[in-house]
Amino acid sequence: MEKLMTESGLKPVVIDSNQDLSRVYCGICSNIGDDDYDGDAVVVDGDLISTPFCSHKFCKACWSKYLKKNFFSVEKNHTAISCPDRDCRAAVGPETVEKLTVRDQAMYELYILKSYREKYLGWKLKLCPARGCNYVIEFHLASEDEEHSLNIVCLCGHIFCWRCMLESHRPVTCNNASDWLSRDLEKLIEEVDKPSTVSWIDANTKPCPHCFIPVEIDGERPWAQFLTCVCSGRFCWKCFRSPETHGTSGSCLAPARSSNVGFNHWNRAKPGISCLDLWNASQVNLVNAKYELEAFEESIIKKPSDLKEQDVKVLREGLMLIVQCRQFLKWSCAYDYIHTEYDMAKREYLRFLQQNASGIVHSFSQSIKEETEAKELTCGKLLSETTNIGNFFYHFIKTLREGLPEVQAESYDNYGGPYWLCDRCTYGNSWFQRACKMCCDPTASKMDELSD
C-alpha cells in the first residue's frame, strides 16, 4: 500500500529534521514568503504554497509558470502533475490549485477535462462544434455505422454528426456531405453565376450538322450565309443545309432551325441547379426554425409565463423537432442531386415526399404557434402531432437510406456488370457513371436533336 501511494504521489509529508526552519524560501526563485521578513522569526505566509503530501513550498508566481508549462507544453497529457521539486513525486491536486489565482484554477480545470477526454477516448467524448458552446458530449457507441451519420443533439440546440462533426446531414453519408459542401455546391453556384456564357454561345454559334461542334458566326460578315467548320464541313447557319442541297437561288428551302440545337439536351442534363434553389429555400426555412426556437428560449428566461414546466418542455421539444426536420429536408436536396440527378422517376417521387414533408412541418409549426398564443395549452394534441411527425420522418429517412425502393429502376446485366437505363434516351450506363454517357456527349445529344 505504501508503494502504491508513493507511485501515485500520495505519500505522507516527511519533514527533514536537518531543514532550516528559521527562514522559508520559494524552492524555485528563492524569494522569502513575506516582504516584511526581518530575519528574526519564522515566516509562514500564504504566498508560499506546497502540496498536502510534501513540504516543498513555492511562491504563486512560480507555481503559475510551472503549471502553465505542464498544462500546455507537454506532448502527452497526464492527469497527475507532481511537485515542482525534481526529487519529489507528490501529486498536485485541487487542494493546492485552489490556493492559487483564478486563472490558474481555470487552467487546471481545462487540463483535467483534457486528461479525462484522453483517458476515456473509448467512450467517445467530444466538444460540441457549435460556436460559443462549451458542452462536452459523452456518447457510448456500441457499434459504429460506417455509412451514415450519427446525429447528436446538444443541450445548446445544435445538431451535428458524431463522425465528421459537420452539421447533421442525414440522409447523405459523411463523404457525400463533404463533397457536396466542398465541390458540388460550389460548382452549381458557379454555373448560376455565369449565365452570360451560355447566352453568348446560344446567340453567336451554330452546331455543325456534320460533327456537332459549335461554329461561331462571323460577326464582321453577317451576310455570309455559309459557315465552315474545323471538320471542313460547310452549312447554312439558318437551315443547316450544305451548299449542294441548299439551292441555287441562295434562299433557304426549309425554315430555320432553333439556335439552341444541341444545347437544349445539355441544359436538361444538368438539373442540379434546381437542387440548388431547393437547398437555398430549405436553408432559409432552417434559419427561421432556429430563430423561433431561440426566441422561445429567450422569452421563457426573460419573461416567465404561466405555463407549467411540462408545457414548456412539450413546446421546446416540438420546436427542436421542427429544426431537425428542416435540417433533414435541407440535406435531402443534396441527396436529390447526388442520387437522383439522372433518374427522373426517383426524382419525381423524392420531390413528392419532400413537398409532403414540408407541408406537414409547416402545419405542425402553425399548431405550435396557435397553442403558444392560446390561454390554455393542449399538451395532448401537441404530443400526438409530435409523435405523428416523428413517425413520418422516421419512415422518410428509412426510405432514402434504402434508395427509394418503391421506384424500381430498369437495369440489365451485361458482361461488364449491371447497368442503369437513362430515362430520356434509354442508353445503358455503368453504375460508375453518374451522368448518362449518351445524353452528356455533345455529339450524341446533337444527333438526337437533328433526328427529331
Swiss-Prot record:
Q: Tell me the gene name.
A: ARI15
Q: Which reaction does it catalyse?
A: [E2 ubiquitin-conjugating enzyme]-S-ubiquitinyl-L-cysteine + [acceptor protein]-L-lysine = [E2 ubiquitin-conjugating enzyme]-L-cysteine + [acceptor protein]-N(6)-ubiquitinyl-L-lysine
One GO process term, biological-process aspect:
protein ubiquitination
SMART domains in the record: IBR
Binding residues annotated for Zn(2+) 6, in chain numbering: 236, 239, 246, 252
Binding site residues for Zn(2+) 3: 128, 133, 154, 156
Annotated function: Might act as an E3 ubiquitin-protein ligase, or as part of E3 complex, which accepts ubiquitin from specific E2 ubiquitin-conjugating enzymes and then transfers it to substrates.
The protein here is known as Probable E3 ubiquitin-protein ligase ARI15
Q: Which PANTHER family match?
A: RBR FAMILY RING FINGER AND IBR DOMAIN-CONTAINING
Q: Where are the zinc fingers (IBR-type)?
A: 106-174
Zinc fingers (RING-type) span which residues?
Answer: 26-88, 208-239
In terms of InterPro entries, this protein maps to:
E3_UB_ligase_RBR, IBR_dom, TRIAD_supradom, Znf_RanBP2, Znf_RING, Znf_RING/FYVE/PHD
Residues annotated to bind Zn(2+) 1: 26, 29, 59, 62
GO MF annotation list: ubiquitin-protein transferase activity; zinc ion binding
Report residues binding Zn(2+) 5.
Answer: 208, 211, 229, 231
The entry sums up its family as follows: Belongs to the RBR family. Ariadne subfamily.
Quick one: which pathway? Protein modification; protein ubiquitination
**Which EC numbers characterise this protein's activity in its record?**
2.3.2.31
Q: Where are the zinc fingers (RanBP2-type)?
A: 414-445
Query: What does the record say about tissue specificity?
Result: Ubiquitous.
Residue span of region TRIAD supradomain:
22-256
For domains, the record's comment is: Members of the RBR family are atypical E3 ligases. They interact with the E2 conjugating enzyme UBE2L3 and function like HECT-type E3 enzymes: they bind E2s via the first RING-type zinc finger, but require an obligate trans-thiolation step during the ubiquitin transfer, requiring a conserved active site Cys residue in the second RING-type zinc finger. The active site probably forms a thioester intermediate with ubiquitin taken from the active-site cysteine of the E2 before ultimately transferring it to a Lys residue on the substrate.
A UniProt-annotated Pfam family: IBR
